[in-house]
Amino acid sequence: DVNRFPVDYLRQVSQLLHKTNYKAILPTHEEGWLLANGKQFLPQSLPIALADQEQFEKLAGKIAFAETADLLGLPTPKWEYVKNADSILLDYPYWLKADYGTAGRSVYKISSKKDLAEVTSKLTASDEEWMVQQDIVGDYGQVQAVFDHGELLAVHSSVKVGSGAGGSAAARLSIESKRTREHVEKLGQYIQWHGCLTLDFIRRGDQFYYIECNPRMVEPANAYKAGVNFPKIMIE
């Protein structure tokens, strides 16, 4: 279990790399963050396109990404830091989000005082930081990109047409979008990102609002069908 024994996971990766000549490692979830933070346990010649620990820290958390997006002028929903339930000023509905969490865990839609009261205990149950983000009605989508130390190599945007677990996209429709390309390129250049980067957005009319960042590759099949082979680009 990588969550319970992260160092053991890193050591096992190192052992596998010494035994077999792997051409590439392709992180598809939070193991990308772990590999960036645990490089001391891994071979120096790690076959992976991966950003540094400091770069991950600017994007991996929901709060850090919101701060970085504000700094760059990227469009996001209104958001606030949460000290306690009484400190929230946003109008209903909004999303209460732990700094680190997924759509199925530590993310709650708050539409009333009753909703907030039901999750208030979670705000003090741990040292986790929280934020609230205004709910926006629109089409959920993602823009995926690959960077080589800040240089954009490939990009693909899509919107959800079918829902999966936790509201994720089980089916996607590729779209042409100059704006999402410009936005993700601006972010990648600023961070000097290396590897895959994915931004989640809500499309409302012709505007895109970025709600969080996945500093990794997400499902690549739709992009492949649209002519963008992210795994191949990462390997090469």
What positions do the PLM features span?
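Phosphate-binding site of ATP-dependent enzymes
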Residues: 111-191, 202-210
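Short glycine-/acidic-enriched loop or helix-start segments at secondary-structure transitions
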Residues: 35-38, 105-107, 142, 222
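A short, GP-enriched loop/loop-strand-helix hinge that lies immediately N-terminal to
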Residues: 19-60, 73-80
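Active-site nucleotide/adenylate-binding loops and adjacent lid/helix of ATP-dependent enzymes
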Residues: 55-137, 147-151, 178-181
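Glycine-rich phosphate/pyrophosphate-binding beta-alpha loops
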Residues: 104, 161-166, 170-172, 214-227
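ATP-dependent carboxylate activation and anion-phosphoryl transfer catalytic cores
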Residues: 20, 176-236
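Glycine-rich, highly charged phosphate/nucleotide-binding loops
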Residues: 1-15
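Active-site regions of enzymes building and remodeling cell-envelope glycoconjugates
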Residues: 1-3, 45-48, 95
